[in-house]
UniProtKB/Swiss-Prot annotation:
Broad EC category: oxidoreductase
Entry protein name: L-aspartate oxidase
EC number(s) reported in the record: 1.4.3.16
Any one GO CC term of the record: cytoplasm
Keywords attached to this entry: Cytoplasm, FAD, Flavoprotein, Nucleotide-binding, Oxidoreductase, Pyridine nucleotide biosynthesis
Organism phylogeny: Bacteria, Pseudomonadati, Pseudomonadota, Gammaproteobacteria, Enterobacterales
């Protein structure tokens, strides 16, 4: 049944992190914008980002150096054009953030001049990380949220999940294939609403919730990647899942990460006996790229049969540690640990999805009118491994470029007066929610065990067989019962799990974040692993 949509806007932005909100604020002067947030508006990966944002502000640094560092960290398969595009626009986009009211830390130089305090993290050859103490994401997110909520042209819908995108040819509309809106699950009212939009932007973040152990908030369930795939978009490089080397090992704080900046300021990684191991692994020691550090920690844990390794900055002055890492210091103190006095137990945990929906310089996907920006996208910036503090930067740069393109094409986009209403005539209320919980746990455990930091062909094949069975069960459940938040996330996550495994099976080498015992060497030449819904098993 066709009906007038309950919601209508010029631009629907699905996601309320740095990518989505920066885009919304750039567009709102001329266009009506709706921003969807799955939970409270600030509950996303941006809020929890500790490290900072990479940009060239130091006169001894250069854009060329930022580019080169990113290419090296990406292990040979970054898109050089994308890297240069982001690095060359970094300072302008960070300045826009400052103009919005974001306060980065400053310090007084020996010559008496005040400047931004720049820190250094793994993979960077210079100090180029702007930060707000050790809670940069919180400063960025709260500033952008405040501005968005007070803008008359931005409507923020909290506790609202996108169920699926509405694509023109799938609902019988004539003309070129394009996105015309989305169905939205209103968690407060517990029903599905129809939203018309001239442009739709996926800013949903990554898919690290596919793993049992993650530093991400619960909402990181790969929604945008799954929706884009179902809409007909290509995805790429999903085998490259970044495991943050230093998540806190503590039963009461499983999602808490210890920022890379700790190692940037001199923290050591140690075995339980107090000895260091990174100097034996890489000449850069603790400042090696994350894939190398995470694999080294994983190797030591397995070699020693240890539950964790340790991060130690107790050799630095107490005041220095408390001043630079106040949030981490306070959190650990609440848990009975003193960062200034003792080594802190850590383990690797799923942290960032380096692949995603294939886009161009403007965040445009394969479907007309559909954009993807931030962690959900594959721009080519990160290659086989994301360099620290390039993620928030990517959000800002593509939020800027997508805004330009959306604004440019808006006058030529025709509105759609009626869209199909969500049909619940053949479904019933769920009676066995334990099925969802069981599938949740099984999926995340098998991904951790078989598609984790170290992989083999047999593990990947085993994972794919079980994922295929889970997909059948979940699709049947989705077809017969009313939607719920857990069901929507599970449906999306099992789809993304399949895509991760298929990308991993395509790559017959070890490179960056993808390490397989069956192909331990790196090929002389390689490129992205690209999957298309039209030919799902195409090789790169």
């Amino acid at each position: 049944m066709m009906t007038t949509p309950e919601l209508s806007c010029d631009v629907l932005i699905i996601g309320s992190g740095a990518a989505g909100l920066s885009l919304a604020l750039r567009l709102a002067e001329k266009h009506k914008v709706i921003v969807l947030s799955k939970g409270p508006v600030s509950e996303g990966s941006t809020f929890y980002a500790q490290g900072g944002i990479a940009a060239v502000f130091d006169e001894t640094d250069s854009i060329a150096s930022h580019v080169e560092d990113t290419l090296i960290a990406g292990a040979g398969i970054c898109d050089r054009h994308a890297v240069e595009f982001v690095a060359s626009n970094a300072r302008t986009c960070v300045q826009w953030l400052i103009d919005q009211g974001v306060l980065f830390d400053t310090h007084v130089q020996p010559n008496g001049k005040e400047s931004y305090h720049l820190t250094r993290e793994g993979g960077h050859s210079h100090r180029r990380i702007l930060h707000a103490a050790d809670a940069t994401g919180k400063e960025v997110e709260t500033t952008l949220v405040s501005r968005a909520q007070n803008h008359p042209n931005i409507q923020v819908l909290e506790r609202s999940n996108a169920v699926d995108l509405i694509i023109s040819d799938k609902i019988g509309l004539p003309g070129p294939r394009r996105v015309v809106g989305a169905w939205i699950w209103n968690r407060n009212k517990e029903w599905v609403e129809t939203c018309h939009a001239k442009s739709v932007v996926l800013a949903t973040g990554g898919a690290s919730k596919v793993y049992q152990y993650t530093t991400n908030p619960d909402i990181s369930s790969g929604d945008g990647i799954a929706m884009a795939w179902r809409a007909g978009c290509r995805v790429a490089n999903l085998e490259f899942n970044q495991f943050h080397p230093t998540a806190l090992y503590h039963p009461q704080a499983r999602n808490f990460l210890l920022t890379e900046a700790l190692r940037g300021e001199g923290a050591y990684l140690k075995r339980p006996d107090g000895s260091r191991f990174m100097p034996d692994v890489d000449e850069r020691g603790e400042l090696a790229p994350r894939d190398i550090v995470a694999r080294a920690i994983d190797h030591e844990m397995k070699r020693l049969g240890a539950d964790c390794m340790f991060l130690d900055i107790s050799h630095k002055p107490d005041d220095f540690v408390r001043q630079h890492f106040p949030m981490i210091y306070a959190k650990l103190l609440d848990l009975g640990m003193d960062l200034t006095k003792e080594p802190i137990p850590i383990v690797p945990a799923a942290h960032y999805t380096c692949g995603g929906v294939v886009v161009d310089d403007y965040g445009r996907t394969d479907v007309d009118g559909l954009y993807a920006i931030g962690e959900v996208s594959y721009t080519g910036l990160h290659g086989a491994n994301r360099m620290a503090s390039n993620s928030l930067l990517e959000c800002l740069v593509y939020g800027w470029s997508a805004a330009m393109d959306i604004d440019r094409r808006m006058p030529s986009v025709h509105s759609v007066d009626v869209l199909p209403a969500w049909d619940e005539s053949r479904v019933e209320n769920a009676d066995e929610r334990v099925v969802i919980q069981h599938n949740w746990h099984e999926l995340r455990l098998l991904m951790w065990d078989y598609v984790g930091i170290v992989r083999t062909t047999k593990r990947l094949e085993r994972a794919l067989r079980r994922i295929t069975m889970l997909q059948q069960e979940i699709d049947e459940y989705y077809a017969n019962f009313r939607v719920s938040n857990n069901l929507l996330e599970l449906r999306n996550l099992v789809q993304v799990a399949e895509l991760i495994v298929r990308c991993a099976m395509m790559r017959k080498e070890s490179r960056g974040l993808h390490f397989t015992l069956d192909y331990p060497q790196q090929l002389a030449e390689s490129g992205p692993s690209i999957l298309s819904p039209l030919t799902p098993h195409i090789n790169r």
